[in-house]
Swiss-Prot record:
Zn(2+) 2 binds at C901, C983, C990, C993. Binds 1 Mg(2+) ion per subunit. The keyword Transferase applies. This is DNA-directed RNA polymerase subunit beta'. Mg(2+) binds at D535, D537, D539. GO terms for biological process: DNA-templated transcription.
């Protein structure tokens, strides 16, 4: 077998008939498969043992040689080599064809490579190949020229003979006519009878003349065709061709079918054709030039690659190994076989029949028909259904050809090469494991035993519980008690990987340390649910076992759940308390007033009745009061603390030099809040507020912000421990909070009817106006929708006011644990407006709440929207998965290759926003809204200087939160940062341009697969949001508008209702022309006016920002009008701009920024944070190539797409050699097109359009350098990312100078040398020798 680690490249080319015969171990001559009586393969058949190898290991077909000792011997009786049966997966055969056939990929593919090479239209090719017309393959012009006068004389002679024959025939007939007339006259016939005879004779003579003329015309046509005869000339008239062959076969050759195509290819001069085509390209224009360009691509491909074009016509076809097209016996004695066997049998049957007919000397028409059938059967074998109706099997099912085995989701690439199944894995339902630590998972004992079976067996033998592996296996299978103890040892510190499908981002697989649990369900840590998007309603997860020490180390260091708290997309924590935990922490940190609580232990200020109460000397004293029932958890108290750090303002006031542990301070707080702060690290500032998951306020603290802050300031291990404590506290206190929901908790509005009656009256007035014709249908619809939305809002607000704070329903919402206020409105107020299947509102609202119950009509109306929601969700989930797949494909080879590419280029990003006072004057600066997603985690490309020109931060500085604050304080509005868009690394990106890894907060490591992380970061929220509509019960935001827009942007499509953009800066002049505007821009530089005609009024003019005269520094948004000024790139109509226009007008940087802004706008509208750098990676891949306009001295073909880094290299070489550089135009490619244009043919073929990619790659003899991840996964090599890159693989360990000196210095023997002898301390007991050493 081939070792994948031996080669560095994989090349694909065209196989010639000699190659096919060289691969083959023998010719398959019969269509038989196996003998149905003996069940042995037939000799010379499709499963022949002589060709493909024995069906049993080390045994020939006849049984003369058995056992491995005869290895390599070829049996003289049956001719089968004694070897392993595994060779039947590798050995190929071949079929010698009685007539050549063309390869359908090259003839029928788009564009037709054969057609371009021979300059024949696909229609004509089809006629030739399938015996519908003849083609001239060669003409002996010299012989024709030299013999032309002789041949012409012969032809004139023949014409004269025809004329003479006709004349004699006519004379003969005239003579006979005279005789007939004389006879009639003698017989006294009437004039009428004589006239008839005369007319008949005239007609006959006319026929003779016409026949003669036709014969002469025919001879003229034959002669004219012959003297103009040229190679590649098609002759559709069969009689004309036969005549030419009869008369002049010595002067030309021709024919029909693949033989003629083969002859044309053999006579084809590649170099001369390429030269001629280049000449046409340089001097021609229009269609002729375009055709020449397309043809030159194919001709140059053969010229450059050294492929023999004759390989496109086959004289022998390969037969793939029988184990890859198996035949298996079913229970009923029937056989199931691969479709390929049927297709091969058709080829062999037709081939044998053709051979027999040729031997018998059958008429040409029959032989040609048989050749055509052979061509069709080979077409069906290679690509069934590509031409004409597909060959079908039983039940009219099209048979799967060789192409179908490669194509699509079930094809070889995606099913078997990229989606292999693995052993040491299991799968089970998940349940919650609240007792687990963040890095642990509960593994069912039986599953663990099966997964760790080899490890357990080894330890059983090592610990002398079993004598050998066989008995150890028996012990494991019988589940002896000792086995469980050994299993505990085997699993300790051996992480397992858990995966939940769909794995939308890298946190869909994480490593955990297993803990054995009873039952059959896997227990998952509650905080890990968010990353896996898991819930416990029947979800299943798969377990995988990393086996080698390296795999275990990687799982522990890189994949352990406690090391993966942050999202790789935004750097925000994913392991966040949710649901019950949030309720518990909200309850714990809630504060209620003393009156409300009414306990003795609550804080009460001093008054005339006595000193202040509720002041505690320590936390222990407060807990004691709580345990005795004197103090409430949420009651306000004052506690003296010395083990928790005070809040920042208290620390600044009381401890100017900084607080040290042990120093006391007085906290105005509640007991619950102190308990919560005990969870946090001791030196974390005290948090005084109520903990919520979302919807912050004055005294509310967002749990996300806390976890974010912890992740930024503390090591991951501390964060993980804190999260675990939060989880425990959350569950503990949510149990004690007694938050439950009963029907009695859903309060109903007492005055809802009166409220709605008012709106009902207004709705009636609208209907009356509509019926009287005062309103159009659209106005009526808009007014009713507006009216009932107001009604829903009013009722909803009243419901909110009705609920007391301690009601569990608003408590769940206010804490951010689940749901939103709108759902409470639906539950207790009214559902409001619902949509129909088209997405329009139904103008009758649902006035009842779920508590009251819907009427039949309301339920029916509601079902439209619900059904639409579910259908949309299902469709968009598939869309989103496909988007992710395309993104991964386009970015999979973007890996961090080097530390620093050394570029000084970068992009400008906003840092600070001005703070204006009422007069519009700048009073200070604040952080820009987009800092988190654009600036954070980058490296400065240039010095950041303030207004005075002083350097605040030097180039190369990492932009941490601290550094960003420095920039904001210095009033620096924007800075130039390093970006992957400007990275100069030829393949992949450099660490400096990428910046920090969002998942770790540290500089990205070399070898990190940042392309795939980027694709996952963009694709995962798309899917999450589409799915989340189902969880929300149809309420709230939805990505409907968003996902198609993201696809449109990444595919670089022209948007629907595309808006034109200004190509120059100037003043606009508008002309109204009915349904359209004509807009003219008068440029500032005095150049020619730019006119935009037929701008749709319906689409509407775009809005523009105009400075307010009354308020300096303030702007208003309004529609463009006459005399407005527009800048370059500004949109003129409402709608999205075409990225291709943006590239043309604003250049590369303009389109980059446009795409980032547009994609981010979609995600921000959904509340999803994705760092710009991920989108930049995809955009970099979209803008990687350019079109060659002038090739200069380089080898590029004009009109071809070239990688810009390659072009740069070729240009510098051309200039160095004193030549002309190539001229290129930047192109923006959609992600699908960019994926297919990749250098790696393996990656492109496994993505889409497999046959087209392989056809193209074979003609160009493409070599895959195995740079990306996908191609290495396909061939089974270690991927070139992470620890798989060469700089980590090829490490040789050498001692340092100091170590070398120490090793070769003269040793001195101290007492320690006589210490440990391996026998341990003296005990008096004998020690077994094998234990001692």
């Amino acid at each position: 077998m081939l070792d994948v680690n031996v080669f560095d490249e994989l090349r694909i080319g065209l196989a010639t008939a000699d190659d096919i015969r060289r691969w083959s171990k023998g010719e398959v001559k019969k269509p038989e498969t196996i003998n149905y009586r003996t069940l042995k393969p037939e000799k010379d058949g499709l499963f022949c043992e002589r060709i493909f190898g024995p069906t049993r290991d080390w045994e020939c077909a006849c049984g003369k040689y058995k056992r491995v000792r005869y290895k390599g011997i070829i049996c003289e009786r049956c001719g089968v080599e004694v070897t392993k049966s595994k060779v039947r997966r590798e050995r190929m055969g071949h079929i010698e064809l009685a007539a050549p056939v063309t390869h359908i990929w090259y003839f029928k593919g788009v564009p037709s490579r054969l057609g371009y090479l021979l300059d024949l239209a696909p229609k004509d090719l089809d006629l030739i190949i399938y015996f519908g017309a003849n083609i001239i393959t060669s003409v002996d012009e010299e012989a024709r020229h030299s013999d032309q006068t002789t041949l012409e004389a012969e032809m004139l002679l023949e014409k004269k003979d025809v004329e003479a024959d006709a004349e004699s025939d006519i004379a003969e007939r005239a003579e006979k006519l005279e005789e007939d007339l004389a006879e009639l006259e003698a017989a006294g016939a009437k004039a009428d009878a004589r006239r008839k005879v005369q007319a008949a004779a005239d007609k006959e003579m006319q026929h003779i003349r016409e026949r003669a003329q036709r014969e002469i015309d025919r001879l003229d046509e034959v002669w004219q065709t012959f003297i103009k005869l040229a190679p590649k000339q098609m002759i559709r008239d069969e009689k004309l061709y036969d005549e030419l062959i009869d008369r002049y076969e010595d002067y030309f050759t021709g024919g029909m079918g693949a033989e003629s195509i083969e002859a044309l290819i053999q006579n084809f001069d590649l170099d001369a054709e390429a030269e001629e085509l280049r000449d046409i390209i340089n001097n021609g224009k229009g269609q002729k030039k375009m055709r020449a360009l397309k043809r030159l691509k194919v001709v140059a491909a053969f010229q450059r690659s050294g492929n023999d074009p004759a390989g496109m016509v086959l004289n022998a076809i390969p037969v793939i190994p029988p184990e890859l097209r198996p035949m298996v016996q079913l229970d009923g004695g029937r056989f199931a076989t691969s479709d390929l066997n049927d297709l091969y049998r058709r080829v062999i049957n037709r081939n044998n029949r053709l051979k027999r007919m040729i031997e018998l000397g059958a008429p040409e028409i029959i032989v040609n028909n048989e050749k055509r059938m052979l061509q069709e059967s080979v077409d069906a074998l290679f690509d069934n259904g590509r031409r004409g109706r597909p060959v079908t099997g039983p039940g009219n099912r099209p048979l799967k050809s060789l192409s179908d085995l490669l194509k699509g989701k079930q094809g070889r690439f995606r099913q078997n090469l990229l989606g292999k199944r693995v052993d040491y894995s299991g799968r089970s339902v998940i349940i919650v494991g609240p007792q687990l630590r963040l890095h642990e998972c509960g593994l069912p004992k039986l599953m663990a035993l099966e997964l760790f079976k080899p490890f357990v067996m080894k330890r059983l033998v090592e610990n002398e519980y079993a004598q050998n592996i066989k008995s150890a296996k028996r012990m494991v299978e019988r589940q002896r008690p000792e086995v469980w103890d050994v299993l505990e040892e085997a699993i300790s510190e051996h992480p397992v990987m858990l995966n939940r499908a769909p794995t939308l981002h890298r946190l869909g697989i994480q490593a955990f340390e297993p803990v054995l649990v009873e039952g059959k369900a896997i227990q998952l840590h509650p905080l890990a649910c968010e990353a896996f998007n898991a819930d416990f309603d029947g979800d299943q997860m798969a377990v995988h076992l990393p086996l080698s020490a390296e795999a275990q180390a990687e799982a522990r260091v890189l994949m352990l759940a406690s090391n993966n708290i942050l999202s790789p997309a935004s750097g925000k924590p994913l392991a966040m308390p949710r649901l019950d935990m949030v309720t518990g922490l909200y309850y714990l940190t809630l504060e209620k007033s003393s009156e409300e609580f009414g306990g003795q232990g609550a804080y009460q200020p001093a008054d005339e009745n006595g000193p202040e109460k509720g002041v505690y000397s320590s936390l222990a004293e407060a807990i004691m009061a709580y345990d005795r029932g004197v103090l409430g958890l949420q009651a306000p108290v004052r506690i003296r603390l010395n083990h928790l750090r005070p809040p920042a303002e208290v620390e600044a006031e009381q401890f100017p030099d900084g607080w040290n542990q042990g120093e006391t301070w007085l906290a105005h707080t509640t007991l619950g809040r102190v308990m919560f702060n005990e969870i946090l690290p001791w030196n974390y500032p005290y948090l005084e507020g109520v903990m919520v998951r979302k919807g912050g306020g004055s005294d509310k603290i967002m749990l996300g912000d806390v976890v974010n802050d912890l992740a930024a300031k503390y090591p991951m291990i501390t964060v993980a421990q804190t999260m675990d404590k939060m989880k425990d506290a959350g569950f503990y206190w949510s149990t004690r909070s007694g938050v439950t929901i009963a029907m009695s908790d859903v309060l109903v509005l007492p005055n809802k009817e009166e409220m709605l009656d008012r709106y009902e009256e207004s709705a009636r007035q609208i209907e009356v106006k509509y019926n009287r014709g005062k309103l159009t249908g659209r106005e009526r619809y808009d007014r009713l929708v507006e009216l009932w939305k107001d009604a829903t809002d009013e009722v909803g607000q009243a419901v909110e006011d009705l609920y007391p704070d301690d009601n569990p329903i608003p408590m769940i919402v206010k804490s951010g644990a689940a749901g939103n206020m709108r759902q409470i409105w639906t539950l207790a107020g009214m559902k409001g407006m619902v949509v129909n299947s088209k997405g329009d509102y139904i103008t009758r609202p649902i006035k009842t709440s779920f508590r009251e119950g819907l009427t039949v009509l309301e339920y029916f109306n509601n079902s439209h929207g619900s059904r639409k929601g579910l259908a949309d969700t299902a469709l968009r989930t598939a869309d989103s998965g496909y988007l992710t797949r395309r993104l991964v494909d386009v970015a999979q080879d973007v890996i961090v290759r080097v530390e620093d590419c050394g570029t000084r280029q970068g992009v400008r990003v906003p840092v600070a926003a001005e703070v204006l006072d009422a007069t519009g004057a700048v009073t200070g600066y604040t952080r820009h809204d987009l800092i988190e997603t654009s600036v954070s985690g980058r490296v400065l490309a240039g010095d950041a200087t303030n207004a005075a020109g002083e350097v605040v931060l030097a180039a190369g500085t990492d932009l941490t939160e601290l550094n960003i604050d420095l920039l904001v304080e210095a009033g620096i509005k924007d800075v130039k940062v390093r970006s992957v868009l400007t990275c100069q690394t030829p393949t992949g990106v450099c660490a400096k341009c990428y910046g920090k890894s969002m998942a770790s907060g540290q500089q990205v490591d070399i070898g990190e697969a940042v392309g795939i992380v980027a694709a996952q970061s963009i694709g995962e929220p798309g899917t999450q949001l589409t799915m989340r509509t189902f969880h929300q019960g149809g309420v709230g935001g939805d990505i409907t508008g968003g996902l198609p827009r993201v696809q449109e942007l990444f595919e670089a499509r022209v948007p629907k209702n595309c808006a034109p953009i200004a190509s120059v800066e100037g003043v606009i002049h508008l002309e109204d022309e009915g349904n359209f505007y004509t807009l003219t821009i008068v440029p500032d530089d005095g150049s020619d006016n730019v006119v935009y005609e037929k701008l749709s009024k319906r689409q509407g003019l775009a809005s523009t920002r105009v400075a307010m005269e009354s308020n300096a520094g303030a702007f208003i948004e309004r529609t463009l009008t006459e005399g407005d000024r527009v800048t370059v790139g500004q949109r003129l109509l409402r709608g999205a701009a075409d990225p291709h226009d943006v590239l043309e007008i604003l250049g590369r940087r303009g389109v980059e920024q446009h795409l980032i802004d547009e994609v981010q706008a979609v995600y921000r509208a959904q509340g999803v944070a994705i760092h710009d750098k991920h989108i930049e990676i995809i955009i970099r891949q979209m803008l990687r190539r350019g079109t060659v306009i002038e090739s200069g001295s380089t080898e590029f073909l004009p009109g071809s797409l070239v990688d810009l880094s390659e072009a740069k290299l070729a240009n510098s070489e051309a200039i160095g050699a004193g030549g002309q550089p190539a001229e290129l135009r930047s192109e923006i490619m959609g992600i699908t097109k960019a994926s297919l244009a990749t250098e790696s043919w393996l990656s492109a073929a496994s993505f889409q359009e497999t046959t087209r990619v392989l056809t193209d790659a074979a003609i160009n003899k493409r070599s895959d350098k195995l740079i990306g991840l996908k191609e290495n996964v396909i061939i089974g090599k270690l991927i070139p990312a992470g620890t798989g890159i060469s700089r980590y693989r090829n490490i040789s360990i050498k001692p340092t100078e100091a170590a070398r000196n120490a090793a070769y210095s003269i040793p001195t023997y101290g007492e320690s040398i006589y210490g440990d002898d391996g026998f341990g301390e003296f005990t008096g007991a004998s020690v077994p020798l094998d234990e001692a050493f």
